[in-house]
Amino acid sequence: MPRHIRQLFSACLATLTVSVLMSGCAWLPPQACLPPSRIMVSAEMIFGRNIGDRPGISESAFANFVAREITPRFPDGLTVIDGDGQWRDGVRNVDVRERAKVVLITFADDAQKRADLVAIADSYKRQFSQQSVLTKVGNACVSF
């Protein structure tokens, strides 16, 4: 099986696993938050920085991506954190490690904002030849 097919399969399997695990998450009832907190959507997006097996997405390229794709969709704010990620390539039976960027976004629940998360991930995959962007979405009690 060609390597790119194996990698795609591994990424799809990881995405499916996260989706199944997240499907059991319960929504918080409004009374679950203590004042002055309120329920908002909390999203974490994890962007790998390798292209293939090699480092390839620079700090400036990622900063430009945030400025063009994320900030216009979420102008109220976001947080970017550096990370080190790893995942198991079951086909090659090796651990793959890479630098990552974690983007945290909190927003009032809105169908368009949820669609924006998908658009951001799709844009990153297209622009940087990525197989996937891990996106985790849930409710959180938030106060500012």
Model-derived segments and spans:
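Bacterial N-terminal signal peptides that target proteins for export
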Residues: 2-13
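Classic N-terminal secretory signal peptides
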Residues: 15-19
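C-terminal motif of bacterial Sec signal peptides marking the signal peptidase cleavage site
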Residues: 20-24
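Bacterial signal peptide processing site
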Residues: 26-28
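Short beta-strand/turn micro-motifs at beta-sheet edges
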Residues: 30-35, 89-93
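Helix-rich interaction surfaces within compact, conserved domain-sized segments
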Residues: 93-144
